[in-house]
């Protein structure tokens, strides 16, 4: 089978398409005939050798996938061959950018009916990340106020949609070119990142930080006493404020969380954010897009099967 591989760490130029043997599902795993798989910033970190969880090369890149189960390993009771599924391969976040991939049965779910495989492959990590930030870490409830930093990104787009569905009051900070897009997703107040004055923002119960840096540090000024700043950006330590809590985490994709997302995808209340769609042999181009080459807004997807 064909697979997107690296044999050493480095830039997009280290990516190759190899012919390798089809993997065999282990205990608690399934083998998926991949229809589509995602390409995301954490794939670039793995490629560069900056991931704390990925194995050493040689390895197959990719974590998000959508496809059809081809075989089932031992101790898997909830899935069978022929099931359409989507989700994540494993806790190491590798192996999905291939014609076949093994996946932990605890990190996949039955694919929702409404989205295509390309759309489904764009969802798992980013949508679950948004869900966890809002409802498992910030614990926000209806009518509370939140501030989203980086609301136009892949996670941000889902965070806005999920927050709007829950009835939260949403302030979003984005670049000027993204303001109308984020407003259309459901944000109540959209501010230009070049002009935002954090101390003038109506005090919020939680900040959802997707960009880190100076904006995250300044955002503490906008949080109510007892509120929280939740971040997925670990490039710098979280500031310590006695009156405001802070939390940093890695997303944990599970069947239960994916099933929640699936319900909303099927009823149309959550819309997939698909960007550029490429073929498997264009994986290097996809990683060049991660590095700044022009591409459509949304998650980059590799279309693998029919």
Placement of each model-derived feature along the sequence:
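A structural motif shared across PLP-dependent enzymes of the aminotransferase-like
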Residues: 92-104
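Mid-domain Rossmann-like dinucleotide-binding core that forms the NAD(H)/NADP(H) cofactor-binding site
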Residues: 121-192
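Glycine-rich cofactor phosphate-binding loops and adjacent beta1-alpha1 units
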Residues: 171, 184-247
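Short, well-ordered loop/turn sites that connect or cap secondary structure elements
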Residues: 79-80, 140, 223
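Glycine-rich beta-strand-centered segment in the early N-terminal region that forms part
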Residues: 21-38, 50-92
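C-terminal hydrophobic helical "lid"/dimerization subdomain
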Residues: 258-306
